[in-house]
Amino acid sequence: MDPLGARSCFVDADALPCWADVRDGEGEDVPDGGRKDAPHGGLHSPFPYRNDINKKVILWRGDVALLSCTALVNTSNETLTDKNPVSDSIFRYSGPELSEEMQKLKGCRTGEAKLTKGFNLAARYIIHTVGPKYKTKYRTAAESSLYSCYRNVLQLAKEQGMASVGFCVIATQKRCYPPEDSTHIALRTVRRFLEAHGAALEKVVFAVTEQEEGTYRRLLPLYFPRSLEEEQRSIPFLPQDIGNAEGEPVVPERQIRISEKPGGQDDDSEEEGLVKDLSVIGSHAFARMEGDVDKQRRLALQGQLSGAAMQKQHQRNYNRWLSRARTEDLSDIAALKALYQSGVDNCGRTVMVVVGRNIPVLLIDMEKALLYFIHMMDHVAAKEYVLVYFHTLTGEHNHPDSDFLKNMYDIVDVKYKKNLKALYFVHPTFRSKVSSWFFTTFTVSGLKDKVHQVESLHQLFSAVPPEQIEIPPFVLDYDARENGPFFPSQSSFLSL
């Protein structure tokens, strides 16, 4: 609480000047490549002058964490642990309660929006969202994801009956998104939302830095003209893609084309092109007819689907997962260092290490975790290997549920199960022993004989030489405290 008589650092959104009050042309430059005398007569802007909407929009140079409004927006990564100026400021002013609240959220996917309280902030709520990483090769996907960020934030605000929202710039430079491109999407999406749901929100604040302000001030007139004259002047500078009725980016090749004469024949050139297009249909794995999946499952239950057909169906499913694992950005999962390849065991088999304490189950997308597991393991599982799982100092928030583990076991290729020769469960607890016994006895019985409960690192070293395995420091410290520095008797070693 501020001392009596002290001036608050927070800024009331209602006290800030709205866009309608900023004079036409004040502080703005003509967009790059344009001329003030560009032809525009007779054209109608897709974003016409509307003073009622302009009164709801505010451009403010300042820290979004200091805004006094119903909700403000935090931009982060999929584990909601990103370090950036916006997030750092929000966490600093909100107090320790926000960090505790974030533990309850199971992360946030790119383009989604999730809600928490504002705690010590002047804002009542914080809406967390995850902007996309920009790569020129995947520009369309990045644009769609960024649109989803803004749209989902606004939709959540509408559903919760919020009066005002303070936006930071969601597409940070850390994620390599071109500032001008991201600003077009932000302004366009907000404009379309206010057109359709203007009664739901009283104020939308764009909180920007000094570096970002110039771009916003230059592009705002395109989407929020403050006069009929400014509306006409802005037309030549609008981008070619202005989105659909909701501001969502439009991909022409994905739109369904409808013939002007459905009952008639197209001309020869169109027919020739159609024949050419049809010639490639079915030439790739994902375009083949698969039949009714539910029917196949019923037949399998009735014993009418052959083992070979089931195996083929399983292989196709795994190949789809593998294709995704090779193309999706899994850098957030890789950064956890929860799964990595080490050396070889006494039999020359590859050693893969899983660090349980590095798996924040509640904060990550477990589907992406499965994709990363497949990405790392596909080439390793082609030959014999062993898994070393460090259960050391794990908590409830580090334990995937049995349904996830069963699903993973069912999805992976048969080579994973065939070539896994041992799973060393290091530093088990009584509870983990009971859980693993039930899981390997009743859920995945084929794994039971391969699981070894390992009480100490000295016991593990009888199977995997210490120089062949990278062990996290906290595991070494724990083992030294619990088991001492000396090797136990040879009789306690693992028998292979």
UniProtKB/Swiss-Prot annotation:
Domain Macro: 44-224
Residue segments, region Disordered: 22-45, 252-271
Disulfide-bonded cysteines: none
Pfam family membership, one: Macro
Ranges of Basic and acidic residues composition bias in the record: 254-264
InterPro entries referenced in this protein's UniProt entry, alphabetically: CRAL-TRIO_dom, CRAL-TRIO_dom_sf, Macro_dom, Macro_dom-like, Macro_GDAP2
Gene3D superfamilies for this protein: CRAL-TRIO lipid binding domain, Leucine Aminopeptidase, subunit E, domain 1
Domain CRAL-TRIO: 329-483
Membrane spanning stretches: none
Family the entry assigns: Belongs to the GDAP2 family.
Protein name: Ganglioside-induced differentiation-associated protein 2
Annotated organism of origin: Xenopus tropicalis (Western clawed frog)
